[in-house]
Each structure stands twice: as C-alpha cells, then as structure tokens.
C-alpha cells in the first residue's frame, strides 16, 4: 500500500478542525501522515492540529495563495499519494481514505476526488451550486476531458505534482487548472462518490457570487487551453465501456 500524506490548509478553523482530524484518525487505511498548513490562525487552530498529532507548517498570510500553501505542505510531506482536504471537510465513515487511494490502482490516473455532502448550514444557492458542479453526485465518473476536481476532498500522485506543481499565482481554482493540465498530458481524473466528506460553507448569496467571480476566470483559462494546446504526444490511459485500459 502506498504511503499517504493528508495535507490540510487552514486559517481559523477551530470549529471543525478537531472533528476532521479525529475522523481521519479513525480510517481503516492507516499508512498516512497529516500535515496542516496554517496561515495565521488566531483561534487555536494550530494547537488543535498539534494535539491530534499533525505536523504543523506555517505560512505568512501575506504570502498565501491556495496553490502556494498546498505546494508548501506537499514539500514538507513524505507520501507517494497526496490527499488535499479542507479543514472543515469532515470524512464520512472509516473507508474514505482507502476509497480515494484505491482509485490509483491504474497508472493512468493522475487524480481522484470525492463527493461533498452539504452540512445543515448550506444555503439554497450553495446547494444549487454544488449540485450543478457535480460534487454531490452518487454516480462515479472517469474524466478524460474538462475535469472537475477538488482540493477540498481530492488526491493526486506526488510524482505528477513534482512535474506540475499547483500554480501559485492563481487566485483560486488551482485544482481544476491542474487537473486539466494532467488531462492534456494524457492522464485521467476519477470521481469516487464513496469517498465522501461533510462540507459546505453556509455562505450568503453575495459571498457565493464573489467566490464564483474569483474562480471562473481561471476555469475559463484552463478550458481555453484545452482547445488550443497541442494534444498529448502519448496517451497514458483510455476508457472503454467505463473500464480503464492502461497503455
């Protein structure tokens, strides 16, 4: 079984951090470490992380971007498979980690992401957005083009991250940008709904709109890249009849 590193980006996440770390520790897949990248918490989040045995890494809030914080956490980790998890995304059940990792049985898979189960505080508009994005779906999916991906509940191969780290200058959607880069190199992205987390933000509509305005230019940029960049020289894998065919 591959060694796994769970990397969590956090700032003032005391409300859910303990719950999330406790759920990780209950996983049946036990060959893992936890790295928490904190960007200036003032509510005791770092202390909670250390109390649960996580390795704590600090990043200056002035230097923070989602991609930079994740790259820093991965650079301080040792796993062959990296799981990126939001501090307020609590794994459901004891098979969550094993189900994410099982998606890498095929060498052609670059990333695996799981389902998001909205918390009770999710607003109507947040629920609608989650449904439209597909991250609440119960249907497994293998993406060959225009993948969704989520660093709130996703995993990727370290060797591919070393080749293509997350873009640190992007304001958001670094996960989707990376996934579509992997697809253009011939890799697959897998959606595994059984690897679920409880996750939502409880945000009002104005903040949801700001988040979308933040992310959509990056998503559009990655989509345009898929139209105009050259096709991969060598396909790593393909899917026939819903099954992986390694090449």
Which residues fall in each region the model found?
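A conserved acidic beta->alpha catalytic loop
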Residues: 38-46, 90
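N-proximal low-complexity "stem/linker" segments adjacent to membrane-targeting elements
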Residues: 1-23
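Non-catalytic, C-terminal membrane-associated alpha-helical segments of glycosyltransferases
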Residues: 206, 210-247
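Conserved donor NDP-sugar-binding/catalytic core segment of glycosyltransferases
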Residues: 90, 94-125
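Short, acidic, metal-binding catalytic loop of nucleotide-sugar glycosyltransferases
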Residues: 22-31
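A recurrent flexible, glycine/aromatic-enriched loop bordering the glycosyltransferase active site
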Residues: 118, 137-156, 171, 177
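Glycine-rich, basic loop-to-helix element that forms the pyrophosphate-binding segment
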Residues: 60-77
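Short beta-strand-to-loop acidic/aromatic patch adjacent to the donor-nucleotide binding site
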Residues: 80-90
């Amino acid at each position: 079984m591959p060694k796994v590193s769970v990397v969590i980006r956090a700032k003032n996440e005391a409300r859910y951090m303990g719950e999330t770390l406790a759920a990780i520790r209950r996983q049946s897949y036990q060959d893992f470490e936890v790295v928490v990248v904190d960007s200036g918490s003032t509510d005791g989040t770092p202390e909670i992380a250390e109390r649960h045995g996580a390795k704590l890494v600090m990043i200056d809030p002035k230097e923070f971007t989602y991609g930079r914080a994740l790259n820093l956490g991965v650079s301080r980790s040792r796993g062959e498979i990296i799981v990126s998890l939001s501090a307020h995304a609590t794994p459901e059940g004891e098979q969550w980690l094993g189900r994410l990792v099982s998606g890498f049985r095929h060498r052609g898979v670059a990333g695996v992401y799981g389902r998001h189960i909205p918390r009770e505080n999710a607003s109507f508009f947040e629920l609608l957005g989650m449904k439209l994005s597909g991250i609440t779906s119960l249907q497994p999916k293998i993406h060959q083009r225009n993948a969704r991906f989520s660093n709130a509940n996703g995993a990727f191969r370290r060797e591919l991250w070393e080749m293509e780290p997350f873009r640190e200058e992007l304001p958001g959607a670094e996960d989707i940008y990376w996934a579509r880069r992997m697809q253009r190199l011939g890799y697959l992205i897998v959606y595994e709904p059984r690897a679920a987390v409880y996750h939502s933000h409880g945000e009002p509509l104005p903040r949801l709109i700001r988040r979308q305005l933040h992310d959509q230019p990056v998503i559009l940029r990655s989509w345009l890249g898929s139209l105009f960049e050259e096709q991969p020289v060598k396909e790593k894998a393909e899917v026939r009849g819903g099954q992986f065919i390694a090449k």
